[in-house]
């Protein structure tokens, strides 16, 4: 780590640049932690309020702002179990202010907009045209708002409705059965109602790569000064599904490393599905209601605790494989397309060394997924969660970062752009990468370019750093496929070629022990390398490992796939060894 004085200077420089370029869109993250512990509200709502009331360096103003935010949340935030109590207060007082998630829909038949309140449980509340026209996110999934409500049973309350001439409709012009006594007097979004992506591009130019990386990590709540460079890159990789369409990511690792934090707390555009049973109707398409499932409603669908994933439908995994490969799926007579990314996170209960020797790094997946090479081949990126430290209090930042809603929205805007071809100017991918490998690497490169260089300005060296990381993330998937599927996935020696020097450079994965086919030095006991022809006739290098474990003398094979001849050969060798064991010297 750098000396404290140098760190402080760097932090101050970053804070000053943030104030100059993103004033009103940054917040001190320790304030979020202070209030979040006692308030069950999304982080992005909390930080928007803090950004409004605590945008100062004066501790007195900040403290007053924190108290204001606490009062607003205590008095106005709607808890679902208190919805009827709040409606009763509204009826009694005639008006009340609430904080809730508001979604607006256009009723074509009645030619007017109606609002729905998520926690309050209200539906079909008329709303003036000016609000959805001014805040278009109300129509695109909804946003959190502070809403002043009125309760009026009689009179000429126009409920926000206007006729075709723009004049307020009178009560006599409306059917009483279609009306609710509740109306919206004023609505104020407490999320970013819209985003100016050019502001982000212009502001990015003021920062170096390392400074911008620190800003992005602090915006997610991490303290970059407690992380080494590789850990920073790995944590940024968690954001790739939010910035890339149809990106399939897997992260397996120890507990308490924050694997699901980003998908649950940081982005309002992603949903975390806890491990358990799910259905094709819920995830993809409900044929009865003719409605698209989660993949059509969210930018990212993350599955927590992958070991518990189970589809009630027999064709669930097949449909998921189709979607992960093409971004579309067929249900009934229709084919539907969606852009949601898929994320699989879970815990590894053994050390990585043990998993590599006895099974594969996909072992925590349920058997129908973890041994299906066609499913696993569709994963673009495998984050080595065991390299990320277990989070302690010092890993969470107290410094300035973007309001999470601002971060989430400009990341969402960047999903519309493509930078996967950025590497073609300087590099060419090696021959061992097939089409799926190439797509995966390009998606990872494109995602990192969007996160680190949203202004599109980067050097060859910076792009090479991203490319090496992308090749490693995809090769980790391919190495495990080779263990599960045998020589069908022999082409794992990923490389790239520099178009200036035509030098080919190979990229390995750290846990495999280097990039050579046969490592230098003596092999571990029970491990040998041999050269032979595979089933296709191609000559290849094979590594054989044997282990003796406590048990009943049963012989088990792993890593051979479904090749019957290969399994029979190992049985023959084992039986020969048993029959001639007394002739083998133990010394």
Locate each region found by the language model:
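Dynamic helix-loop-helix/coil hinge segments at AAA+ ATPase domain boundaries and subdomain interfaces
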Residues: 199-233, 559-567
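Extended, charged/polar low-complexity intrinsically disordered regions
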Residues: 2-219
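Conserved P-loop NTPase/AAA+ ATPase motor core
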Residues: 508-587
């Amino acid at each position: 780590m750098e000396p404290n004085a140098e760190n402080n200077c760097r932090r101050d420089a970053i804070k000053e640049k943030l104030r100059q370029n993103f004033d009103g869109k940054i917040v001190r993250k320790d304030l979020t932690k202070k209030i979040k512990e006692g308030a069950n509200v999304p982080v992005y709502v909390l930080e928007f309020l803090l950004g409004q009331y605590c945008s100062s360096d004066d501790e007195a103003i900040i403290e007053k702002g924190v108290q204001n935010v606490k009062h607003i949340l205590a008095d106005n935030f709607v808890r679902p179990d208190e919805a009827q109590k709040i409606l009763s207060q509204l009826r009694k007082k005639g008006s009340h202010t609430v904080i809730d998630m508001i979604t607006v829909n256009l009723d074509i038949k009645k030619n007017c907009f109606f609002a729905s309140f998520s926690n309050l449980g209200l539906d079909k509340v008329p709303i003036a045209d000016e609000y959805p026209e001014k805040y278009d996110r109300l129509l695109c999934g909804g946003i959190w708002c502070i809403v002043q409500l009125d309760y009026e049973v009689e009179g000429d309350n126009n409920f926000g409705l206007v006729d075709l001439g723009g004049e307020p409709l009178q009560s006599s012009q409306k059917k009483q059965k279609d009306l609710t006594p509740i109306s919206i007097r004023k609505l104020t979004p407490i999320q970013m109602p819209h985003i100016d992506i050019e502001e982000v591009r212009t502001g990015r130019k003021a920062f170096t790569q390392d400074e911008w990386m620190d800003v992005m990590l602090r915006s997610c709540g991490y303290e970059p000064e407690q992380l080494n460079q590789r850990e920073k890159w790995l944590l940024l990789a968690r954001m790739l599904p939010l910035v890339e369409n149809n990106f399939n990511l897997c992260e397996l690792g120890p507990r308490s490393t924050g694997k699901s934090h980003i998908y649950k707390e940081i982005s309002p555009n992603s949903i975390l599905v806890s491990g358990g049973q799910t259905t094709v109707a819920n995830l993809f398409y409900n044929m009865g209601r003719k409605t698209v499932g989660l993949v059509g409603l969210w930018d990212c669908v993350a599955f927590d605790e992958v070991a518990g994933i189970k589809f009630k439908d027999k064709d669930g995994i097949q449909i998921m494989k189709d979607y992960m490969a093409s971004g579309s799926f067929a249900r009934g007579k229709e084919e539907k397309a969606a852009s949601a990314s898929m994320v699989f996170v879970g815990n590894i209960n053994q050390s990585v060394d043990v998993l590599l020797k006895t099974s594969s790094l996909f072992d925590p997946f349920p058997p129908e997924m973890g041994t299906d090479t066609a499913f696993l081949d569709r994963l673009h990126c495998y984050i080595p969660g065991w390299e990320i430290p277990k989070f302690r209090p010092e890993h969470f930042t107290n410094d300035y970062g973007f309001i999470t809603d601002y971060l989430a929205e400009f990341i969402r805007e960047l999903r519309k752009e493509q930078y996967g071809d950025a590497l073609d100017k300087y590099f060419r991918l090696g021959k061992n990468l097939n089409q799926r490998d190439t797509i995966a690497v390009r998606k990872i490169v494109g995602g990192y370019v969007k996160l680190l260089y949203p202004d599109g300005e980067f050097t060859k060296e910076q792009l090479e750093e991203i490319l090496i990381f992308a090749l490693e993330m995809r090769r980790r998937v391919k190495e495990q496929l080779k263990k599960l599927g045998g020589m069908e996935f022999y082409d794992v020696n990923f490389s790239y070629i520099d178009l200036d020097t035509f030098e080919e450079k190979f990229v390995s994965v750290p846990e495999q022990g280097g990039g050579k086919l046969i490592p230098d030095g003596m092999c571990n006991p029970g491990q040998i390398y041999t050269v032979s022809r595979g089933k296709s006739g191609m000559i290849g290098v094979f590594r054989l490992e044997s282990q003796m474990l406590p048990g009943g003398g049963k012989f088990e094979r792993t890593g051979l796939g479904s090749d019957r001849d290969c399994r029979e050969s190992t049985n023959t060798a084992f039986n020969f060894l048993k029959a001639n064991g007394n002739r083998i010297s133990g010394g």
